[in-house]
């Protein structure tokens, strides 16, 4: 089915207000969920909203909590999220990293005791739109086996790197081949994954999203490389924030909350003039996109460039929502 942005935001707002969330908080949160969905990231927008409400109802998320700065060391700050709403807090933290970068050239905010930030790419994009390089990542509850294991002991720990090119170039990637949200998107659409995304119950690689969702044997991106990167990202976020590691979140909490996150902004214009920056970025993009195609019918992709078209399509033709997901939201 198709809905307008206003209908989608209104549905989110209704549910949030029914939980006695303050009007301004409900409006900003509903706006972020709707913008994420409108941008084509359904897995962490509309599809994720019922799970967000479940955690809100369970008390994992404290909607009126106010993040507090704990430590300030010039370009580096440490904050405690106080388990406030994840996407609103993450937006504020990237804004703060940008403020620090405007003073120091680089700004880093390390956040502890946070909630799921929904679409991590929103915060990298937020920095790049203002002309900054944006880098951020989060740890999570253990939802992926480390390379060589069957049990989930590491997080998918998504990493975002956004570059202020025209259009914005951005990598927004889980340390698994697919996030659990993308497994759900493909299952709901009745599709196999385009490449292997995990292991079946017999330990064989599989493209069946439902099998992987059930047995939780998701495949690390790049096999042992994604596993290793997940581990070091967790270590850095834990140390810089003085917050909880994947192990602590998994063993000490009843669900995924109290995670640790990093937000970095770099003001490129302090290092290079705008015309030179644009020329260098354009040369990189042209060099890549003019390569001989492996398939004449498949364009060479630059990361993040597809979001401009997705956003335009959804604004022109309406936002496609899975019927079953919409029914869940209407029932909340």
From Swiss-Prot:
The record's subcellular locations are: Cytoplasm
Task: Give the residues annotated as active site.
Answer: 44 (proton donor)
Q: Which GO terms describe its cellular component?
A: cytoplasm
Q: Determine if Oxidoreductase is one of this entry's keywords.
A: yes
Answer whether the UniProt record assigns the keyword Oxidoreductase to this protein.
yes
Which branch of life, at top level?
Answer: Bacteria
Assembly and oligomerization: Homodimer.
Q: What is this protein called?
A: 2,3-diketo-L-gulonate reductase
Q: Which species is the source of this protein?
A: Salmonella typhimurium (strain LT2 / SGSC1412 / ATCC 700720)
Which lineage do the record's taxonomy fields give for this organism?
Bacteria, Pseudomonadati, Pseudomonadota, Gammaproteobacteria, Enterobacterales
The encoding gene is dlgD
């Amino acid at each position: 089915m198709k809905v307008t942005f206003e209908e989608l935001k209104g549905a989110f707002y209704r549910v949030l207000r029914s939980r006695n969330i303050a009007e301004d908080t409900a409006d900003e949160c509903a706006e972020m969920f709707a913008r994420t969905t409108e941008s084509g990231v359904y897995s962490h927008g509309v599809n994720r909203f019922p799970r967000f409400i479940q955690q809100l109802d369970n008390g994992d998320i404290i909607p009126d909590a106010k993040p507090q700065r704990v430590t300030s060391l010039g370009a580096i700050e440490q904050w405690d999220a106080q388990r406030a709403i994840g996407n609103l807090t993450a937006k504020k933290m990237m804004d703060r990293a940008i403020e620090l970068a405007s003073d120091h050239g680089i700004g880093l905010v390390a956040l502890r005791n946070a909630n799921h930030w929904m679409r991590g790419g929103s915060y990298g994009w937020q920095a790049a739109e203002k002309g900054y390089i944006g880098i951020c990542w989060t740890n999570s509850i253990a939802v992926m086996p480390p390379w060589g294991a069957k049990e989930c002991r590491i997080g998918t720990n998504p990493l975002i790197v956004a570059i202020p090119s025209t259009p914005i170039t951005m990598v927004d990637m889980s340390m698994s081949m697919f996030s659990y949200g993308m497994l759900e998107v493909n299952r709901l659409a009745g599709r196999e994954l385009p490449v292997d995304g995990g292991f079946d119950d017999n330990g064989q690689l599989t493209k069946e999203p439902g099998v992987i969702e059930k047995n939780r044997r998701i495949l690390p991106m790049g096999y042992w490389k994604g596993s290793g990167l997940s581990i070091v990202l967790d270590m850095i976020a834990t140390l810089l924030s003085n917050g909880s590691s994947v192990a602590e979140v998994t063993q000490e909490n009843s669900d995924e909350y109290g995670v640790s996150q990093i937000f970095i902004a770099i003001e490129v214009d302090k290092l290079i003039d705008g015309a030179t920056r644009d020329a260098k970025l354009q040369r990189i993009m042209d060099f890549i996109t003019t390569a001989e195609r492996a398939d004449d019918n498949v364009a060479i992709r630059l990361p993040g460039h597809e979001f401009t078209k997705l956003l335009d399509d959804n604004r022109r033709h309406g936002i496609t929502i899975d019927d079953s997901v919409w029914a869940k939201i209407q029932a909340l």
